[in-house]
Every structure is written in C-alpha cells, then in structure tokens.
C-alpha cells in the first residue's frame, strides 16, 4: 500500500516552479495541476492533504484526486463552532479551508472528526509589553475511514496544532476514536494508519504515540528541509522500503510517501 501526505499550503506556488509569480491565482492553478500530476505518477493508494482551499470553481482536492484516479474522497472544513450541531451545519458546506482525504480503495466508513481545539481567544501577547490580544485558533479536524483492502484498514488523516499540550491531546483523541471505530465495526485488530502534518518533530512524536513511525525523512521547509513535521504512523504495518520526499510546484512543505505492507 502506497501512502502519501502533503501539506499543499492552499495551493501556493513556490520558488521551485519555473516562472512562478507568487500570489497570482492563474499561476497557482497551473502549479497545483503540475503538483497533482507529479503525485499521480506515484500511483498512491491513500492520499492525505492539509491546508486545502476549496472555493467555487476551484477544488484542490478534485485536482489531486482526479489526477490520481481516486474515486473516493472527503473534505473537512476547519471551521470554528461552539456546538456539535453548528459544526454539523458548517460541514454541509463543501467550500472553505481544511483537510482532505482520497483513496483508490472502496470505503466502508468515513467521518469527519472534530479534535479538541477550543482555546480562550483572549490571551496575553507573546510580547507582554503589548498586553492582551484576541485570536481564534483554527478548529483542528481529522478524517477517519475504514478501507476495504484485502483486510480492513482504519485510516486517520489530520493536521494538528503547533501548540502543546493540545497537540498531544489531539493525537490521543484521534487514536482513541480510530480504536473505537474498529471495535464497533467488529474489526478490533484491524491495522491502523495516521498520516498528515502533525506539527511535531520526529523525536517528540515517538514519545507521544505507541504507533510505529513508518516514514522518516525531512519535510520542512521545502527548499532546504531541516525537520520532519509531516508523518505517517501505523499499527499492524511495517515499512516496505525507505520513505521518499519530493519538492513539488506548490507549498512550503515537501510531499512525504512510503510503501507499507
């Protein structure tokens, strides 16, 4: 099974793209198509995207999924909501900013999951001389799916916060939910995968989870990567080879890919 995770940074062209003029929509669209074609050549089975922008007349998810021939896909908007009811109302919209998931496998179950993200919007500024400030944190989300491979697999695609201890809480919440999904669907021993921009360095992620790190490679920043904050983790899988990264036409992250069995 080939797994790919990529933070697309809203489809912004980067300096690696010949002739790129940053900020111009037409150029960004061309860069998105080129990046999507590059990933399609890898023939991924599972694709997780972060910082996805879905607007009228423009769909980053569709560009990547259609290029790779992935029929099954899901977008989850990262919108603030004070209640689960309002969150469900917001999720009816297929537009906005969020995360996305696509796969070539049949999907038996799929759901967007809100992760613990609500923080007091009023806080002391980092430079305390300027007192207090108001800022709404991004609502962090995950997409959890059960894939019908030769044996069922539970997959969680996500984009976690940079803040601790919230980051650890979000990862724990996702792992617990995936285990519960497996039990409720009668597949408690099903292998599980978590992939995405986890905003945590490799040495820290190894302390936060019992999942095995399946891909080790520097992913950020895109031009001269010095750290790995994008990860592919698993239970019941092992890496079938070394992880690969690639600088594509969009984003300040590198794409991360690995084969597992």
Regions found by a protein language model. Name each.
Residues 9, 52-53, 159-161, 198-201, ...:
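Catalytic metal-binding/acid-base residues of hydrolase active sites
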Residues 46-51, 157, 193-195:
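Short catalytic-loop micro-motif centered on adjacent basic/acidic residues
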Residues 22-30, 131-136, 217-221:
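A short acidic, glycine-rich active-site loop
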